[in-house]
């Protein structure tokens, strides 16, 4: 430890914070020595320089004696309201602030074993509790583990643990290959330091090497070899004078103790299913506590091995042991020993102390870690909380990065968008994105996108080798097919079949497959959108009224629009995306989600109108309800003597032949056939079709409900984790299959999916290629630039807003975005679709969000009680590419797809609309309008923004959304893309209505021109700021620094924090332990 820095305790009260250069070489700099660069800054209050220098000299000359503590305490008491840097915090700063190349410390499994008597005779180590993140206890008499719960500790046990660490043996980075060798080493160290009498070594060794019984083992059925064998307890064995010489006694002890010890894990350990909860590199921390009758003072040892070693059956699971804490004490204090064991086990499961335990260099580092824990611990009044109540683990754990970062001296860790800039509510502004930085060069952004995505091109294919990708393909395929059929049908009605269902299938397949293969963000799904449909209808009517060739006019609009998009790509216009804040994103995505929900119910209501319910039907008068087909009045074909035809023969005969050459029985005609051939439907039941509407709504709501339920099944308590995850991943596919089977079993003739079975244009008046000239006057080619401007705005807004939503920080995408590359391919595909007279395609918000949700990854191993952590999204190109290839092949799968009821697919539409609204802050704020104040959730923005301001912001967002909805439903829908662009202007105007503080929580702060310069200044200020002041402004980026009161544990000590390690007065130590603590 000669190279370790010596820390001047007095320096910590001078409000000095070391910069990175000083911290980097702290092993060779003596902090107490005057360094001009370090001490140029002075305290804010006025003091005489001579007095300050005098105090520094006194501290150095007295070798950091106790007097310095008293002086510092007096000084701190005079300025207690000013932020202080405790010596423990300063020490932890050096421990956690070290930059080494070693990997992060592994996950720890902590096990608490207590020395208990079995059958009143044998003493064994019995496992009573275990920790990974939360505590699990062995239920008394239940032979089962308790549910994971938050460990509640008594404050007294933490102080006793601190005393144990001060007085016991601390052995760091020791080497041992077996448990007997390790126990021997600990006993010898205790004897060398005078903490253990030599004649007690054998007894301690015998006790520590007793058999370990874990909860996974069943009741012990003794074998024949064990019958008659009795092993006395340590006290009786050593108290018997007939045991022979000490040497013989030692041999007997060793042989009997080592019977159950093996360096290899047992079969029960290898079969333990609890290993699934641990990562592969996990290590163990064993805590052994118990009471014995041969010790007068506690036997305390904390050991950290240089390398983790497998110590046989010491641990419940077959993981190597790194830490060992031993506490053996006199009889009568078993409860105190148990609580101390729980305290050290809980500390080892704490992320900050866990890192300190791995990096500690001496006893004082460990004590500083305990002091840091005590600084953060929360105390509950004894009369207001029952400690026997087990606290359920929270759904989301607070990140320890804030605590670690406070000591590491680094910048604020950006996790999931929770930075000071965005107020900790995720979805931060886009000004920091590298993808949105304007290069100022021709096609600079496009070139950077290509360079950024090219290294990941190969991994975009093999990263899809997971069963989760299969479920995503099937789910998105059915959603895409349904959308293509729906849009194709509407487009056919709007354009007189110049573009129909087949064109929709072909365009979706070609555009989507090419985009997913080469675009910057392959997770984005291309589809036709409502605004595009409105534009196509208006364009067709305009061409029809002015005798223009619709497809040629549309071709030139597409070419002009593609050219404008390419100009936007070349000029890096995508940097404007940084002005699309949460307000714009949520307004647009919520509108699209509401459209999906509205269309799903609209289609079901239309279906109910087509197949109405007979509300006047009465069971007692069922003879009054009938329907018959009568022949037309001029000719009565039903009474002819000619041949009568069966209904199945009718479709092959023309109506003319039927009327003049043949006769048939009208009573056998179907409803459609009767109307087709001029018959009359007579009866009061002719307008009603029984059960179809009711069955359709059952399929519709059943598909939606089961999809939602099975998607949430991952967090349920039933079935193993693997089964729950599999059901959740295939939730939508399973729902579709289940209700298709139900529909087939019931046998009601519900409307089914209709897919074109022939590959040819829908209209015979068009081909697969549109000539650019010949159909319209020459000037139409130039005039097409005007409507093309509207299309360009629509394409740009739709594409980039969806791209922003897909690339949100909370999705944790690792391969980067490609805004310019995406828009480039949309423009190229627009040219292709214009020449082939196929629909135009752009990013679809709801389906893209559904695609991302179906590919989300979570941790495979999570501690009991801990929610699986979201790792990111499986970024690849395979799912999207295969979805669109299957869409193109759907023409050949018509015989299979025709069995899928349309209400089932409408239920999938409803699910996608509702699912895409989950987690949207706008929806959370809408719910607040209906909640009483006391029942409102603890959202971060409710802590810092007055509720009336929150409601005002929500009202303005609802107003904009309502205007957009009204606009899209009227003839003025042609300017819909312009109004979406107007959302950005509305958000800019909110800067005059709301403060930047409020907007930083409710929305994103719009980036400023000199933002980078301001951020650099902010970083410099952070380096100069006080380390120990509370960082509550991380939740409140615009709040003022508020002084905090910190009373560090070290001020209360009698011993200097970093003085030379002097031998402890053993008698005084023993007296102190007996009088004040269980240790």
Swiss-Prot record:
Give positions of region: Disordered.
39-78, 235-266, 1012-1079
Spans within the Cytoplasmic topological domain: 1-466, 521, 572-585, 711-725, 808-819, 856-877, 919-960, 987-1079
Q: Which residues carry this modification: Phosphoserine?
A: 61, 65, 68, 223, 232-233, 245, 256-257, 262, 1026, 1029, 1034, 1044, 1069
Q: In which tissues is it expressed?
A: Isoform 1 is specifically expressed in pancreatic ducts and acini. Also expressed in parotid acinar cells and in the colonic crypts.
Task: Extract the NCBIfam families matched here.
Answer: ae (TIGR00834)
Q: Where is this region: Interaction with CA4?
A: 748-779
What the entry lists under InterPro entries is as follows:
Band3_cytoplasmic_dom, HCO3_transpt-like_TM_dom, HCO3_transpt_euk, Na/HCO3_transpt, PTrfase/Anion_transptr
As its record notes, the protein acts as a catalyst of: 2 hydrogencarbonate(out) + Na(+)(out) = 2 hydrogencarbonate(in) + Na(+)(in); 3 hydrogencarbonate(out) + Na(+)(out) = 3 hydrogencarbonate(in) + Na(+)(in)
Segments of this protein annotated with the region CA2-binding: 1002-1004, 1030-1033
Q: What is this protein called?
A: Electrogenic sodium bicarbonate cotransporter 1
Q: Which GO terms describe its molecular function?
A: monoatomic anion transmembrane transporter activity; sodium:bicarbonate symporter activity; solute:inorganic anion antiporter activity
Region ranges (Required for basolateral targeting): 1057-1059
- Job of this protein: Electrogenic sodium/bicarbonate cotransporter with a Na(+):HCO3(-) stoichiometry varying from 1:2 to 1:3. May regulate bicarbonate influx/efflux at the basolateral membrane of cells and regulate intracellular pH.
Q: Among its keywords, does the record have Repeat?
A: no
Q: Lineage, please?
A: Eukaryota, Metazoa, Chordata, Craniata, Vertebrata
Q: Which residues carry this modification: Phosphotyrosine?
A: 30
